[in-house]
C-alpha cells in the first residue's frame, strides 16, 4: 500500500471516529428514537404515573388533613362522639331507637332557636300511592349578619334503615351538621342558616317533604344536602342544581367532585334518591354532598362505626363549614360540568362546553380534510381501503371477546376484571393491526391509526354535544378528542412539508422505522432511526388521555360495581361500563400498539390467561366484598320468611340455618324477573307481641260510590300500609269524611283535622306514618264497585316493625361471612291482615 493510500485510509478512519455522536446524543437517541425498547419504557412509565396520580387523587389518607386549630379540633371530637351515640343502634323511623336519637339531638340544640317540627302532610308519593306522614324534624335557625341574603338550608336525616346502624347513611351527615352548628355558634355567618335534622328519609324522603310545608322554608334560597350511599371514604359532590351554585364549591378546602355522578342520576343509572330531589323540585338551588362507596355495605350492618374514620367525617364536615361561608351566588341557573383533580376544582356551564365542542367538531374536519387531500395527491402518500380496516375490525372483535366469564366477579375484584378485559382488548388490537400492517404496508400506518381514533372520538363527541344538558359527565370526551385530533393534525402538517422521495426529510417525518431486532439499525433508511416525532405524538396523546380515562372510569366503577348484585339489567350495565372503560383505556396507545415488544405482549397474555382462569375459579364474594341479601318476615295467614337476592345464591345460604335444618322446613324458591329470586320458609322464630286488629265501620252509598272506613289497632307501631284493589278507590281520608265525594276537591285537602286525598284515576295504596306508638289509625275511603260484585271490597293491611326480630337475628348470625343483610321492606317484619268492607 502506498503512503498516499495509507494517508487516505487514516483520514477516513479519523473522520468516521470524529463523526460518532457523543454519549449524551446516543442516550437521547436510544430513549426517544422509535424503538421497541423506548416504547416499552414510555408505556411502563405511563401506567405507573397514571395509576399513582389517580390513587393519590382519590385517597382519603393522602389528601385530607385533620384540623390543627383548637376550635376545629374540639368540633371534630364532639361530632365524632355524636356519631358514636347516634349510631349505637339501628334507628329506623319505626323503632324506639329513633326516638332516642331525636331526643339526643334535641338536647344538643335546646339552647338555640329551634322548632320541633310537628307538620302533618299528605301527598301522592307515587303512581296510585298516597302517603300520610307525621313529622318530627328538628329545625335550628342561626341568623346571619346580612338579612337581605336568602337563607341557606343544611339538611341531613337522622333515621336509618332497620338493617343498618346508619353511620354513613346518614349519621355522618347529621354529625357534620352538628359540627357546622358549633362552628357558626362561634362565628356568625353572613347569611342565615337553617338546619333540618329530618326524619324518615329512607322510606320516601318524608322529612324533606315536611320541611317544604314549614314557615321557615320561605326564607330559604339555597341548600346543601349531606348524604351517604356507601361506608366511609371521601365525600363527593354528587350533583348540583346549576352552575351558579356549583362554582361556590371551589371555595372549600378539600374539593372532591365529578359531574359523572350527576349524569348517572339524570340518566337514571343511579336509582336511589336523596332529599336533594325534594328541595330542587321545590325551587331551591343547591348541592348534594355524599359518600359513595362501597355499596355492598350500604344499608347493612356493615355500615357501622368500625368501617369509618374521623378523617372521613372531617372531609364532609370541613367542606360544609367552608361552603356555608359563601358569598353572593351567581344568577346562572344552567346545568354545570365540574370535576376535581389533585385538589383543584373546575366548573363551567354546560353551554360553554357545548360551544367548545362545536368549534372542535367543525374546526378539525375543515382543517384536516384539505391537508389530507394535498398529502395524498401531491406528496404521494399511498393509502388503500385496507389501511383503514384495522381499527374498526379490532374494536368490534374486542367488544365481542372482552367480557370475563364470571358475571358477579366485578363486585369483589373490579381491578382484576378490568385488567383482564383490557389485556384481551390490547392483544386483539395488536394481532389485528399487525395483520393489516403485514398485508398492506403504509408509509405511516401510525398516522392513519391516529386519524381513525380521532374519528371515533369525533363521533362520540357529536353524540355528547347533541344529547345536551343531561350529559354533564362526559366532559372527558372533549379532552380526548382535542389531544388526539391535535396530534393527528400535527402529523398531517408534517406530511405537507415532506419532499417527494429523493428530497430532504422534513422535521416531522412521515417515515416509519422498519427493523428486525430491537437494536438493529435499518441500513436502507439510515435517517429513520433518528425519527423522534413519535415521542412527541406519544407524549401529547397517551399520558393525558390515560389519566382522564383511568381516573374517570375507575371512579365510576367503584361507585356502581356493587350494583351488579341488584338485577340482571345492572349486571349488563356494569359489564358495558367495563368494556367501554377498557376500550377507552386502550385507544390512546392504539397508534403505537404494533411496536409493542415481546415482553409487553407476553405480560399481557399472562394477565389475560390468569384473569380468565381466576374468573372461573374465584368465588365472586368474600368478607371484604360481601353479597347483599334482603330480608322480610311476613306474619299472617302463612307465616313466612322471605329472602331476595340474585339467582343461584340464596338457597345455599338458607339451607344451613339451624331453624331450617331442625324443623326440616321446605325452602320454596321462585325465580323473579331480571335475574332475581325469592326463597321462602317457615322459620318457627315468629316474633311475639306483634298484633294488628282491623275493624270495619258502617258504609254508605253516595253518587254511585260506596264510602267505608276501617280502624287499625297496632300497638307499638308507627308504619302501616293499606292496599286497595287497583283503580277502584277514588278518595282516602285519615280521619272521617265530612263531605260527599263531589264536594271533595281533587288532590289534597284538609277539613276539621281530617287529611283527605282524591284521585279520580284511582288509589291503590295508602301509606301511614304516625308518631304516637299506640294511637289507632282511622282510615276512610270511597270506592267504585264492580258490576259483578255486590259492592264489597277486600282490603289488605300490613304493618311494619323495624326492631330486630329472632328470624333476622338468626340469618345474620349463621350466614357465611361473605353475606350481608338488608331490609326488603320498610321493616324487618310485617303483620298482614285482610278485611272485607
Swiss-Prot record:
Glycosylated position list: 143, 561, 689
Pfam families named among the record's database cross-references: Peptidase_M28 (PF04389), PFF1_C (PF22250), PFF1_TM (PF22251)
Protein name: Vacuolar membrane protease
Keyword Protease among record annotations: yes
EC number of the protein: 3.4.-.-
Membrane topology: Multi-pass membrane protein
Cofactor(s) annotated in UniProt: Zn(2+)
Alphabetic keyword roster: Glycoprotein, Hydrolase, Membrane, Metal-binding, Metalloprotease, Protease, Transmembrane, Transmembrane helix, Vacuole, Zinc
Cofactor: how and how many bound: Binds 2 Zn(2+) ions per subunit.
Family of this protein: Belongs to the peptidase M28 family.
Enzyme class: hydrolase
Transmembrane segments: 37-57, 356-376, 385-405, 416-436, 447-467, 475-495, 540-560, 573-593, 599-619
Annotated site residue numbers, Transition state stabilizer: 298
Source organism superkingdom: Eukaryota
Cytoplasmic side: 1-36, 377-384, 437-446, 496-539, 594-598
Binding-site positions, Zn(2+) 1: 157, 169, 227
GO biological process assignments: proteolysis
GO cellular component: vacuolar membrane
GO MF: metal ion binding; metalloexopeptidase activity
